[in-house]
A protein has these predicted regions:
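Long, contiguous binding/interaction regions
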Residues: 1-66
C-alpha cells in the first residue's frame, strides 16, 4: 500500500531524515507532501505518531493507487 501525508508547513531536512521511508516534495498550498509504501494500517498510525512527535501537523492522509 502507498500513502500520502499532507503536512501543513514545509518539513525541515532534519525532520525528513527522521522519516527515511517517505519521500517528500513541496505541496502547492505551501505545505509538504510526504509519501511512500506502508505495510498495513498499523504502519500508517505509527508514521502519524512519529510525525506528531516531530511537531509536524498532518492535515490530510490518503491512500494512493499501487
Amino acid at each position: 500500500m502507498r500513502y500520502e501525508f499532507i503536512v501543513r508547513d514545509p518539513v525541515s531536512d532534519l525532520a525528513a531524515a527522521e522519516l527515511p521511508e517517505l519521500s517528500s516534495c513541496p505541496f502547492p498550498t505551501g505545505g509538504t507532501s510526504m509519501f511512500g509504501s506502508v505495510q498495513d494500517e498499523a504502519d500508517v498510525l505509527t508514521l502519524l505518531a512519529r510525525m506528531a512527535n516531530l511537531g509536524l501537523v498532518v492535515v490530510e492522509v490518503r491512500r494512493l493507487p499501487d
